[in-house]
Amino acid sequence: MKISANSIRTGNILVYNNDLWVVSKTPEHTQPGKGGAYVQVEMKNLKTGTKRNERFSSADYLEKAELEQKDYQFLYFEGDDLVLMDTKHFDQINISKEMLEEKLSFLTENMIVKIEFYNDKPLNIELPPTVILEISETDPVIKGATATASYKPAILENGIKVKVPQYLEIGEKIVVKTDDMTYVERAK
């Protein structure tokens, strides 16, 4: 499917120079004083992992990879792989832990994730937008602390460090965004 350079977004997977590239940063739209407008795009090659900056004219059209998305349930770790099961057909697949990188610590047993495939090859794992985790370490509650904008550091059960409001204590469950690893709210 062709998309205009102005429509490129972070996370898009493009077919460029016969390779698959994922857009890794928000594209910068620039309108110089002289010359035509262009879009500066930082991309990462999905095969080699190399990064590249490309400049496309606003009038350019690029090929967006058509991906098939399926729901999978995470079962367990096997060496350097994740073992996941298709929720519809119950087929199991192994995928390298490297595909999740720093978000690996959010993965919990039986979690449902979305896997994007291109020509039956897994390219990307998408976690749920938020997860509920327990606070395992933080400073004690300060008397009189209210839900103001003052935050303290906390370490969650999976080892991730986040800033939480002063009134939260060890053992409480909180909602955390998986994309930027930030506190959302106390779990209900």
Curated annotation (Swiss-Prot):
Pfam families: EFP, EFP_N, Elong-fact-P_C
Keyword Cytoplasm: yes
Pathway of action: Protein biosynthesis; polypeptide chain elongation
Family per similarity comment: Belongs to the elongation factor P family.
NCBIfam families in UniProt: efp, PRK00529.1
GO CC terms: cytoplasm
Keyword terms: Cytoplasm, Elongation factor, Protein biosynthesis
GO biological process entries: peptide biosynthetic process
UniProt function note: Involved in peptide bond synthesis. Stimulates efficient translation and peptide-bond synthesis on native or reconstituted 70S ribosomes in vitro. Probably functions indirectly by altering the affinity of the ribosome for aminoacyl-tRNA, thus increasing their reactivity as acceptors for peptidyl transferase.
Protein name (database record): Elongation factor P
Compartment(s) of residence: Cytoplasm
Gene Ontology molecular function, alphabetical: translation elongation factor activity
InterPro entries attached to this UniProt entry: Elong-fact-P_C (IPR015365), NA-bd_OB-fold (IPR012340), Rib_uL2_dom2 (IPR014722), Transl_elong_fac_P/YeiP (IPR020599), Transl_elong_KOW-like (IPR013185), Transl_elong_P/YeiP_cen (IPR001059), Transl_elong_P/YeiP_CS (IPR013852), Transl_elongation_fac_P (IPR011768)
Coiled coil: none
